[in-house]
């Protein structure tokens, strides 16, 4: 579906769009079958050889729903919405819709281990929605770890060969930030991690390495019960600020919580195949750092620069765009997301979203590298209050990429080159005029980015800068020296 430039007015507000459950609850809704593979998700007996003609035409969509946290009820509702929408016919001659789901037994029950499932949703010959359990994982499995994420994706790849893979990742998140940093930055210490996986030739098979997703202390932040729940929240109350990296399993009891979180490099390394698209139904993932880390793992990526209200994407219409159509249309999913929020009012009229062509990101990196090199002193002199923010409270780690470059003193020619590079890679972008009544959005490039800080601001930025230097975006552009 093609989108044109469109301005939507809602009263005096304007928005710009452009185009270039618990175990028992889930078992009640399933018709179980003999699992295709073992509970470790290794994909035993899967077809890893040459694909047939039908397999080349097949589309596979995976919803990875990591809800062993405060989003439990919202993520269960998302799956029910998915079941109520368009469903593919029975395997093996039709497209595949898979859901990996893991939630707490009940709200706040973070000390009770539960069982994750991989299920397949389809419509039978009588038009009934069927949910088949393919894999039952061991109770206590941590879903927000690179090891489990890799196990699930490997099972999907080995057992459902296809010409097109897509994924929706739904959980808590805080973009490029390292695990544990967001909730308590003064306690963060950068510790280098081993590379957990390497690409072999032109494939994406893993070498036998150890994944290093480590639990970090959980610190419950303050919350404002008057605000809506967001997909970066920590507690069981609405309006809670976020503390996540990519995904979250919150484990333990009050006063002794720990959190399992993936960092963006771990997330990327754990992916064993190439995706056509990845859509993040999670907060603050819309950064250039995230996109660049994933550019060799997917062709397109959809994400939000701001937090995501807990209702998230529109799951009722999602499969119509991603599976029913001959060619998947992730842009339509992004558009549906934005339209459901621009129609709201007050704090609920809050959303940003962009769809990125990852194949065009290298040109953007070249342009930005030259600008960063030419305006090193300008970057250091930026007044943060002059730059477009995408964060609430004092979590000052997410600013608009173009706004940073403008404030650094880029020339007219440099800005022209930047705009041309952005136009090539930002397929779609949309934003509401305000976000939760806390800040206006006046500049929007389709990417957030870190605004480098030094020890004169806070001592822990030395640790954050050390971590940031390991990201592929910084290696390509030299933003942080």
What is the role of each PLM region?
Residues 1-2, 16-55:
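Bacterial Sec-dependent N-terminal signal peptides
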Residues 1-9:
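Bacterial N-terminal signal peptides that target proteins for export
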Residues 8-17:
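Bacterial N-terminal signal peptides
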Residues 24-26, 42, 194-481:
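Terminal, contiguous helix-loop blocks that mediate binding/assembly
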Residues 57-60, 90-97, 160-166, 272-277, ...:
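Loop/turn elements at helix/coil->beta-strand transitions in domains of secreted/extracellular proteins
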Residues 70-75, 106-110, 175-179, 285-290, ...:
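Extracytoplasmic/secreted cell-surface and envelope-processing proteins
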Residues 101-136, 164, 168-251:
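Surface-exposed loop and adjacent secondary-structure segments within mature catalytic domains
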Residues 121-158:
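Functional beta-strand-loop-alpha-helix junction segments that form "active/interaction loops"
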């Amino acid at each position: 579906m093609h989108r044109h430039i469109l301005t939507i007015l809602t009263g005096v507000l304007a928005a710009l769009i452009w185009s270039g459950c618990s175990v028992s609850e889930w078992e009640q809704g399933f018709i179980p079958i003999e699992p295709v593979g073992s509970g470790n998700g290794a994909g035993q007996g899967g077809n890893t050889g040459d694909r047939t003609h039908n397999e080349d035409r097949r589309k596979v969509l995976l919803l990875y729903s990591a809800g062993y946290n405060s989003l439990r009820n919202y993520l269960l509702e998302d799956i029910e919405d998915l079941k109520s929408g368009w469903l593919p016919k029975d395997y093996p001659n039709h497209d595949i819709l898979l859901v990996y789901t893991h939630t707490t037994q009940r709200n706040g029950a973070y000390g009770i281990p539960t069982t994750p499932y991989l299920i397949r949703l389809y419509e039978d010959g009588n038009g009934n929605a069927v949910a088949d359990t393919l894999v039952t994982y061991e109770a206590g499995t941590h879903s927000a770890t690179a090891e489990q994420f890799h196990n699930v994706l490997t099972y999907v790849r080995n057992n459902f060969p296809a010409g097109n893979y897509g994924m929706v990742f739904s959980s808590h998140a805080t973009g490029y930030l390292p695990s544990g940093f967001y909730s308590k930055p003064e306690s963060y210490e950068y510790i280098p991690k081993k590379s957990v996986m390497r690409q072999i030739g032109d494939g994406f098979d893993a070498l036998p390495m150890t994944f290093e997703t480590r639990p970090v202390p959980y610190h419950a932040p303050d919350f404002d019960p008057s605000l809506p729940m967001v997909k970066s929240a920590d507690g069981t109350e609405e309006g809670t600020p976020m503390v996540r990296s990519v995904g979250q399993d919150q484990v333990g009891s009050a006063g002794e919580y720990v959190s399992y979180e993936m960092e963006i490099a771990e997330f990327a390394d754990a992916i064993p195949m190439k995706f056509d698209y990845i859509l993040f139904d999670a907060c603050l993932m819309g950064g250039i750092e995230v996109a660049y880390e994933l550019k060799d793992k997917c062709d397109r990526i959809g994400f939000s620069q701001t937090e995501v209200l807990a209702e998230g994407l529109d799951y009722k219409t999602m499969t119509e765009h991603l599976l029913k159509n001959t060619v998947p249309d992730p842009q339509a999913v992004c558009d549906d997301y934005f339209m459901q929020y621009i129609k709201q009012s007050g704090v609920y009229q809050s959303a940003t979203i962009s769809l990125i062509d990852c194949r065009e990101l290298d040109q953007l990196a070249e342009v930005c590298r030259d600008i960063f090199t030419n305006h090193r002193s300008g970057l250091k002199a930026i007044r943060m209050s002059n730059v477009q923010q995408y964060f609430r409270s004092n979590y000052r780690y997410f600013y608009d990429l173009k706004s940073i470059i403008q404030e650094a003193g880029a020339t007219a020619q440099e800005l022209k080159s930047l705009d041309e590079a952005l136009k090539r890679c930002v397929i779609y972008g949309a934003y509401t005029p305000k976000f939760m009544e806390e800040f206006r959005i006046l500049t929007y490039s389709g990417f957030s980015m870190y605004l480098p800080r030094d020890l004169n601001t806070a001592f822990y930025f030395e640790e954050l800068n050390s971590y940031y230097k390991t990201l592929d975006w910084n290696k390509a552009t030299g933003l942080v020296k």
